[in-house]
Amino acid sequence: MAIGSGTFTLADYALYSNQPAVQAVSMSLIDYGNVLQDIPMVTKQTLQANGVRFEGNLPVINWSPLNAEGVTVHAQPTPYQEQAYLMRNYVDVDKYIVLDQNAITDTRASQAKAVLKALTYDVNFKFFKNAHDGTGDPNAPVGLRARIDDAAGANKFGVRPENKIDCGGATADISQAGISAAKGNAFLEMLDLLLWSVGSQDGTGIVLYMNDYMKRRLNFVLRSLGTTGGLDESKDQFNRTITTYKNAVIRDPGVKADQTTRIIAGNAIPAGSGSVGETAAGVDSTGASANFTSIYAVNFGTDYFFGWQFTDGPNVQDLGLINNGVIYRTLIDWAVGLMNNNTRSIARLFDIKIG
């Protein structure tokens, strides 16, 4: 299923909303590269959503001769439940700052933009790295890495263990010093396996998430194998450049709120003290063994991986001068959750040697 088929994404909501404040917030989230722009959103007023998925428990089909009766078959899907998580923030500005005629810009608008920028950094990080194992934020959704890692254990999120794919390290070395035709082809084979693992061999409906170094290195690999153009590029409805591998959209989730640390680690520096990336086992690290990175693949759609929201899009309310008489307040909140409806929705390719 293609991204957003039959559902509204954040981008659609920004285009259709007739509330200037909501439109501004939605567009800001898109401009800052929030991953929520990719996720098809279903509106459902519930804090918990229930679903079922088939995890190898399909019915056995009966074949019979003429004049024989049919055989009753029954499928027993696996039930699951996800919960909504709340993003709730106030933007408070003193009334005298609001009334100051010497202000160059709208102070409340500037503060709101700063909050939205911070929100994007935080959402992007949590979408990939948040965990409920004591190391992350229990008030935010479980991220892709933890969902995929859990497949080999409790498998609470319906992900096949095979969807955590080892690229092979030195076998598919795409560092500038180690690249060769054989290794480049080995890497592309594993990248195609990543697409296959999320149910779309040609990449339709898929978003590939990688950091900026990995994106440049992918172009480098394609050119080194004799292709002239590298990755394909087109424009979206906001006239932004969209890069694709086959039909899969490529996105870089960027950096954390410190505006330095990459969300998907890997700085392509050869093994040494300057390396900041992942180990061959896919663990974030620094130093001599941290010259690897990962690529995440997500099949977005209501049959695969999607989200639900309590109301249509983010709630933006100008609460005006609150009852203390000195503060103008703007409320920005949103109740959202993530749902995995298929065992072939999300996957990770790790142990990619880029340094």
Model-inferred region functions:
Residues 7-10, 100-104, 108:
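Disorder-to-helix initiation segments
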Residues 116-124:
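Sec-exported extracytoplasmic/periplasmic mature domains
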Residues 107, 111, 183-186:
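Short amphipathic alpha-helical segments
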Residues 113, 117, 189-192:
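Solvent-exposed, polar/charged alpha-helical surfaces in well-ordered, non-transmembrane soluble domains
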